[in-house]
Amino acid sequence: MLNYVIKRLLGLIPTLFIVSVLVFLFVHMLPGDPARLIAGPEADAQVIELVRQQLGLDQPLYHQFWHYISNAVQGDFGLSMVSRRPVADEIASRFMPTLWLTITSMVWAVIFGMAAGIIAAVWRNRWPDRLSMTIAVSGISFPAFALGMLLIQVFSVELGWLPTVGADSWQHYILSSLTLGAAVAAVMARFTRASFVDVLSEDYMRTARAKGVSETWVVLKHGLRNAMIPVVTMMGLQFGFLLGGSIVVEKVFNWPGLGRLLVDSVEMRDYPVIQAEILLFSLEFILINLVVDVLYAAINPAIRYK
């Protein structure tokens, strides 16, 4: 197992290098001139050229790439073109709000999604199954931005129960986490149901029932563990999606997180911030997939990596 983890970690190096090259090329292909955006609409050509020199955009592209890669290897992603603060500080100040929003959304989505999936599988083709899957399909189909605006209109504007924007208190997490986790809970419910339906028909489940084990214990002890492998895979993918893909929700709720920072950086063509954020998202996905693979062995001892 240790050798497998080490090999996967070493595999990060070429993957992140390829991502770095692609991201660098992508941001420099974006339309628009960062120097013109930063200088302002009334700046003349001389001022814009001065800003370009200050940002290093007047240098050849290969020189900019070498400067970017050599500094990134040392953990230095440069200064933000807009705020002139270190990129690491910009990301660090936005990381925790996104992380807590992701964890909050994931916790309720996993609990609700797995419960709905188990209920649907146990009472297959009956009204609990149909009700759970109808709710799940609705959760997948309803766009996140529309759900967020609906929740704000009902619970903030009409009823006045919850705040609309910001991340200052636990109350701010309620509507935003519900919006962000709705699709995840729906996907989790469908995956859990599909996995449980297959497990419930296995021989060891019938053997446990024949021995007089209660149905609840059969489902929770024998069924849940064996049905968890595909569910854990989906949990890992969805966690990575939430951590890096909460852009729409953060924009709707004016959330001070990484998603909103990325949108603002793209609008202002802030190359260093865009490059660092996408590298961070790539690293998150790779590490989450590694954790999921390691969890396989903990859930099912028959799985071993040699």
UniProtKB/Swiss-Prot annotation:
Q: Where in the cell is it found?
A: Cell inner membrane
| Residue ranges occupied by any ABC transmembrane type-1 domain in the UniProt entry | 95-292
Q: What GO terms in the biological process aspect are recorded for it?
A: transmembrane transport
List the keywords (alphabetical): Cell inner membrane, Cell membrane, Membrane, Transmembrane, Transmembrane helix, Transport
Q: Which Pfam families match?
A: BPD_transp_1, BPD_transp_1_N
Known SUPFAM superfamilies for this protein? MetI-like (SSF161098)
Q: Which residues lie on this side of the membrane: Periplasmic?
A: 30-102, 156-168, 250-277
Q: How does it sit in the membrane?
A: Multi-pass membrane protein
Key word Transcription present: no
The record ties this protein, via Gene3D superfamilies, to: MetI-like
List the GO terms this entry assigns under cellular component, sorted alphabetically: plasma membrane
The regions listed as transmembrane in this protein's record are 9-29, 103-123, 135-155, 169-189, 229-249, 278-298
Where is the major localization of this protein? membrane
Topology Cytoplasmic: residue spans: 1-8, 124-134, 190-228, 299-306
Identify its protein family. Answer: Belongs to the binding-protein-dependent transport system permease family.
Record note on quaternary structure: The complex is composed of two ATP-binding proteins (GsiA), two transmembrane proteins (GsiC and GsiD) and a solute-binding protein (GsiB).
Stated role: Part of the ABC transporter complex GsiABCD involved in glutathione import. Probably responsible for the translocation of the substrate across the membrane.
Name of the protein described by the UniProt record? Glutathione transport system permease protein GsiC
